[in-house]
Design a protein with these regions (language model features):
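Class II aminoacyl-tRNA synthetase catalytic cores and aaRS-like
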Residues: 1-598
Length: 598
């Protein structure tokens, strides 16, 4: 039966005692991890969130009832031990433990909670399937690596609170029951009981409210915000997620970015003791696409694109010439020394990879010692091949991979995916490197072939660049935005923009997105109405806290830095949500489900 504390107070966490405290009496509390019964000696690895301390029960030095109680301890029992800190014998020292030189010689024991045999071993090297670990998440979270992840996440939020408070930011909470303004991802809806037929939406971001706070005179806002998006899940996405959300008034783009760079520098120093050099590099969206095929490029390695469109535009190879004539491009990657690394079978596999990104195929040119081997050599002149090799700085031993298409988006996506695959296979993604950069000057709009209309690339409140305002009426697709993303090792960790603060420009923006004036006012009237009462220039940024924590902890999945995550069906395997609710609850909310009718 579980015992009560009855006045016992923990004096130390398990990994806190030091050699300077040898001989001191202390009380430790935690979970029994490893345990060994050697007859007259029992060794328990007592674990809490700080680490593990070996506790030794010596039969010859303990009352009979204490030792017999110790004999009943099994894995994951919750115990409290009163004892004296001692040095281990030299031959018993464990150099792999922070407390490996120490042990607690037990004098008294309380068993505070008993445990059934866990469904998997509570250890970092556990082989249990993730589904099982998520079902018993409260046990999975006891593993040292998971505890370390949660502690690091907590440290990140603490640093954010401290840094932005020092910079004059005010923490303000925004509503989680909001108006549905469908544009982009689907909303999670909450039915109103008191207003039948009406619904709240859970916020996809605090965007509108933080802009309204700027209108309200709070010139620097910060919040650790919970956000919700009803979208198909990927490895790095969850239906509910957390943002470090920020907004500033009376600023331009550089002002926002400079404040964020200070945060990044401090964050990396205090979490990983990594010194980040400022200012961070900046490249435009177009440059990022042209060089890396991605708006969140991994710059830890090269393998940059080489545009050879002008060289091959009139060549005899139809795949190349047609791509250029169709308004697209031909680009290649030069893999230095690639001849030694890749077999023909592997090259064929690369061809299959680019086809998954709608490329028609992969062309290649191999600079072997005995001469050039090329999948398209007979269609090009010697001068054209020579020009390609010179532009790509190719030499003997190198191999070039080409993708051509009449749509640059296909070339970017296909060759960009190949670049990342090559980086992985060649071991170029150094986990000890932290390459931050800003991507700026995004397109204001992106065209949807499926819907036949433009959408806002970021959101409809992003300000166009001043010099592009006239293009809104003449060439909408060429308008650039005052938008900026911060990227780390190929991952977008934050994004923001300078916002529109002119009512006229905001109305024009909605018009260009296909909203009638009535539709815009129906959805966003409370914001547009507020714009009439004096709006300061403002802008901001939001970091994805989950993704940031994943990268800093080097976790393999975003689920490993969230205490109770969902799986790809947006379900919680531990609690069983979402679940069917009682009919009475539905009736009270004036809801009838389609499944009921069927």
């Amino acid at each position: 039966m579980a015992e009560l504390l009855q006045g016992w107070k923990r004096t130390h966490y398990c990994a806190e005692p030091t050699v300077d405290e040898v001989g001191k009496e202390m009380v430790l509390m935690g979970w029994a991890g490893t345990w060994r019964n050697l007859g007259s000696l029992i060794f328990i690895g007592l674990r809490d969130r700080t680490g593990t301390m070996q506790v030794t029960f010596n039969e010859s030095e303990l009352p009979k009832e204490v030792f017999e109680k110790a004999e009943t301890i099994r894995s994951e029992y919750v115990i409290a031990v009163k004892g004296v800190l001692a040095r281990r014998d030299e031959k018993m020292v464990n150099r792999n433990m922070k407390t490996g030189e120490l042990e607690l010689i037990a004098k008294e024991l309380k068993i505070l909670g008993v445990s059934e045999t866990p469904p998997f071993y509570i250890d970092d090297n556990v082989n249990a399937a993730e589904q099982l670990r998520l079902k018993y998440r409260y046990l999975d979270l006891r593993r040292p690596c998971m505890q370390a992840n949660m502690l690091m996440r907590s440290k990140i939020t603490r640093i954010a609170h401290e840094y932005f408070a020092e910079q004059g930011f005010i923490e303000i909470e925004t509503p989680t029951l909001c108006k549905s303004t469908p544009e982009g991802a689907r909303d999670y809806l909450v039915p109103s009981r008191v207003q039948p037929g009406k619904f709240y939406a859970l916020p996809q971001s605090p965007q509108i409210f933080k802009q309204l706070l700027m209108l309200s005179g709070f010139d620097r806002y910060m919040q650790i915000a919970r956000c919700y998006r009803d979208e198909d899940l990927r490895a790095d996405r969850q239906p509910e997620f957390t943002q470090i959300d920020l907004e500033m008034s009376f600023v331009e783009q550089d002002d926002v970015m400079n404040v964020q760079e200070g945060f990044i520098k401090r964050l990396m120093k205090e979490t990983l003791d990594v010194d980040i050099q400022l200012p961070l590099p900046r490249i435009t969206w177009q440059e990022a696409m042209d060089r890396y095929g991605s708006d969140k490029p991994d710059t830890r390695f090269g393998l940059e694109f080489v545009n050879v469109s002008d060289i091959v535009k009139d060549c005899g190879f139809g795949a190349f010439a047609d791509a250029v004539k169709g308004g697209g491009s031909v680009r290649c990657i030069n893999v230095e020394g690639g001849v030694e690394h890749f077999t023909r079978k592997q090259i064929d596999a690369f061809g299959d990879l680019v086809k998954t990104y709608r490329a028609k195929g992969l062309a290649w040119l191999s600079m072997k010692p005995e001469g050039i081997q090329c999948s398209f050599a007979k269609f090009l002149t010697e001068d054209q091949i020579k020009a390609i090799l010179e532009r790509a700085n190719a030499k003997t031993g190198d191999i070039l991979f080409f993708v051509a298409d009449a749509k640059d988006t296909v070339v970017y996506q296909a060759l960009g995916a190949l670049r990342l695959e090559l980086g992985r296979r060649l071991g170029l993604m150094d986990d000890t490197k932290f390459n931050f950069l800003w991507v700026i000057e995004f397109p204001q709009f992106e065209w949807s072939e499926e819907d036949g209309r433009y959408y806002a690339m970021h959101h409809p409140f992003t300000s166009p660049m001043d010099e592009d305002l006239d293009l809104l009426d003449t060439d909408q697709g060429k308008v650039r935005a005052k938008a900026y993303d911060i990227v780390l090792n190929g991952n977008e960790i934050g994004g923001g923009s300078i916002r529109i603060h002119s009512p006229e420009v905001q109305e024009k923006m909605f018009e260009k997105l296909g909203f009638t004036k009535e539709e815009a006012w129906e959805r966003f009237g409370f914001l547009m109405g507020a714009f009439k009462y004096g709006t300061p220039p403002h802008g901001g940024l939001a970091y994805g806290l989950d993704r940031l924590a994943m990268l800093i902890t080097r976790a393999s999945s975003i689920r490993d830095v969230i205490a109770f995550p969902k799986v790809q069906t947006a379900s919680c395997l531990m609690s069983g949500c979402p679940n069917v609710v009682e009919q009475a609850q539905l009736e009270e909310l004036h809801i009838e489900t389609v499944a009921d009718k069927e």
